[in-house]
C-alpha cells in the first residue's frame, strides 16, 4: 500500500512556492521553487503531479490572496465617498502591496500564460465587477463599474510597462475627479 498524502505538507509547499513566485515571478524550472520550499523537485512532483500542475496551483493561490486583499480595498464603506475608497485602493494596488501581483499577473496576460490558466483574462476581469458596481451605485452610476475597471487595468498595464508612477497616479486621480463631478 502506498504512502498516504499529507495535505498539510502539500499546503505548506504551496504556500512557500506561492511566496517565492510573488517575490520573483514564475520560474522556468522547478529548482528555485523546491529550494524556496525546502524540498526537492521530486517531492514537488509527488505532491503536484507536474510542473505545470504546480504552477497552476501557485497562480490560483496567488489569485485568491489578491482577490481577498483587493476586494476589501474596493468594498463600499458606509461613511466614505466611494472615490476616496478608490483612491486609497489605487495607492495600494499600484504601490508596493500590489507590485508582486502586477508582476506575476502582468506576465500572465501575455499569450504564454494562457495555457497555464485557460480563461485567466476573463476571470481577472469579471471578478472585480460586482464590488465596483456596488460602490458606483453610491454615485448613482453602477453602469460605470466596467469603465472604472478598464481605467484601473489600463493604468496598471501602463505602469507595468513604463514605471511612470507619477503620471499614472495623476491620470487616476484626474479620472476620479471626473466621475465625482459627473
Model-derived regions, located:
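Short, basic, alpha-helical segments at the C-terminal edge of helix-turn-helix-like DNA-binding modules
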Residues: 60-67
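Amphipathic alpha-helical packing segments from all-alpha helical-bundle domains
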Residues: 67, 71, 97-102, 106, ...
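Amphipathic C-terminal alpha-helical segment
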Residues: 107-111, 148-168, 177-182
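Helix-turn-helix
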Residues: 12, 16, 20-53, 57
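N-terminal intrinsically disordered/low-complexity leader segments
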Residues: 1-8
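Recognition helices and adjacent regulatory flanks at domain boundaries
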Residues: 5, 18-22, 61, 112-116
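Solvent-exposed, amphipathic alpha-helical segments
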Residues: 12, 16-23, 69-73, 104-111, ...
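Hydrophobic alpha-helical connector segments
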Residues: 57, 70-102, 144, 148
